Amino acid sequence: MSKTISLLCRALVFVSVTSSLSAQEAPGKIQKRTYPFKEAGKDIEYALYVPESYRKATPAPLLVLLHGLGSNPHEVIRYQGVTVEAEKRGYLVVAPFGYNERGWYGSQGKGQGLFGRTPGDPENLGELSEKDVLNVLGIIRNEFSVDSARIYLAGHSMGGGGTIYLGAEYSDIWAALVPMAPGYTGSFDIIEKIKAPMMVVAGDEDTAVPIQMVRLFAQKMKQASGTHVYKEIAGGNHGTTFYRNPELMTEIFDFLDSKVLRGEEEVEPFQEPLRIFRNKSGKKIEARIVSSDGRKVTIERKDGRTFTVKLSSLSEADQDYVSTWIAESATEP
């Protein structure tokens, strides 16, 4: 294991691929967004794709897509075939930053992780990276009509490791997982915590994530459940095999399309309780929270009338309440 980790340490930094990602974008537009990450004390970027077919009245499947080490949301969402397939099939796609280019999404612990450390990074980088994914998921679930039985998680390299980790930690959320060339160095016991079917994809000539390590993970994975799939690409590398391979993306979306979160019971829609909201000038309104994108919040009075206000216009207590509501919404199955 020490040899494989050494290889990973030397080669895992994912080369920026912006110039190589020739546009295969669907008619919908990739949006560059930010939201205020309170615990981090700054705004964090994420990328979002909304298909032209999206309608609020029809819940849409959602793919959460995690980038690799040294990359960012705007690169991974432009992997060839991603938005094309999303448009064809009606998927929302969101790519969180995971705080920065090297957060590891919590897969290497709450601190800075083994690889990619940079002076100035917060001591709790892994914790912030994990929370950023959940924050963005909460924002999208609040703003859009998302099919809760069809929320998927996929990632490349560092993002593949994050997919395995978050897939286990929040196993009730995901209908399927797709780790691609996963940079995962933790215990394989994590497989026992994963409930969703997995499709692991790797190239047999990958020099960043040793294929022997992925094969061992895949072997343990298939022993744990017959629903998991392992795809090894002959001659496949760590880069173009994934970001310049629309045929692979078609296979991945085919896999996602076949998976739905099971065991959900029909229940009456939950309605948030009424509470008193105050703005900074002291004016009060009794209402319930409806949605928030992290910058604005929509609230509804008892009579059904809705209001959308800037989050910053509310009292500190109400801002904290909305932030907590967003975080809790992200982890609801």
Model segments located where?
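A domain-start/cap signature at the N-terminus of enzymes
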Residues: 21-62, 74, 129, 265-268
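Short substrate-entry loop that stabilizes the transition state in hydrolases
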Residues: 54-106, 207-208
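Alpha/beta-hydrolase active-site loop
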Residues: 120-144
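Short beta-strand/loop motif that positions the catalytic acidic residue
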Residues: 194, 199-202, 206
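C-terminal catalytic histidine-bearing segment of alpha/beta-hydrolase fold enzymes
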Residues: 212-269
